[in-house]
């Protein structure tokens, strides 16, 4: 069976590099499933989980918290360039929980002062923290 090479790259380096038979990501237009021989494509990614189903006998599934970025698909090579990304096994859940609480406090404070920019920034931080928490539970 044909497989794809999947790489997730952040400013800190390569976070993931394996072969896969199926990938699921979320773009602004919704969830996108990627199979081998997918058309060439570049698309923005939302803050969301990335599901990678590896090939082979064990059918292992890897989960990665993607915090924005882009995906490029070309000739069975899938490259995700993300602001940050963490595999489920690498997520510090207590740190993510603290980030969630901090973001919720910042949203409340910004809403009382009607600071729209701070509300938006804090909501992004909250989405990122919730994404990390959700992926850690996979």
Curated annotation (Swiss-Prot):
This protein's name: ATP synthase epsilon chain
Subunit structure: F-type ATPases have 2 components, CF(1) - the catalytic core - and CF(0) - the membrane proton channel. CF(1) has five subunits: alpha(3), beta(3), gamma(1), delta(1), epsilon(1). CF(0) has three main subunits: a, b and c.
Membrane protein topology class: Peripheral membrane protein
MF terms in GO: ATP binding; proton-transporting ATP synthase activity, rotational mechanism
Transmembrane segments: none
PANTHER family (alphabetical): ATP SYNTHASE DELTA/EPSILON CHAIN, ATP SYNTHASE EPSILON CHAIN, CHLOROPLASTIC
GO cellular component, one term: plasma membrane
Family, similarity comment: Belongs to the ATPase epsilon chain family.
Biological role: Produces ATP from ADP in the presence of a proton gradient across the membrane.
InterPro entries: ATP_synth_F1_dsu/esu, ATP_synth_F1_dsu/esu_N, ATP_synth_F1_esu_C, ATPsynth_dsu/esu_N
């Amino acid at each position: 069976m044909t497989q794809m090479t999947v790489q997730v790259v952040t400013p800190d380096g390569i976070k993931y590099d394996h072969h896969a038979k199926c990938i699921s990501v979320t773009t602004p237009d919704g969830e996108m499933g990627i199979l081998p021989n997918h058309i060439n494509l570049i698309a923005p990614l939302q803050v969301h989980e990335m599901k990678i189903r590896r090939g082979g006998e064990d059918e292992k599934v890897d989960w990665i918290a993607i915090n924005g970025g882009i995906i490029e698909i070309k000739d069975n090579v899938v490259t995700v360039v993300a602001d940050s990304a963490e595999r489920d096994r690498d997520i510090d859940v207590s740190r993510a929980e603290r980030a969630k609480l901090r973001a919720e406090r910042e949203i409340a404070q910004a809403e009382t002062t009607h600071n729209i920019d701070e509300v938006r920034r804090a909501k992004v931080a909250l989405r990122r923290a919730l994404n990390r928490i959700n992926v850690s539970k996979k």
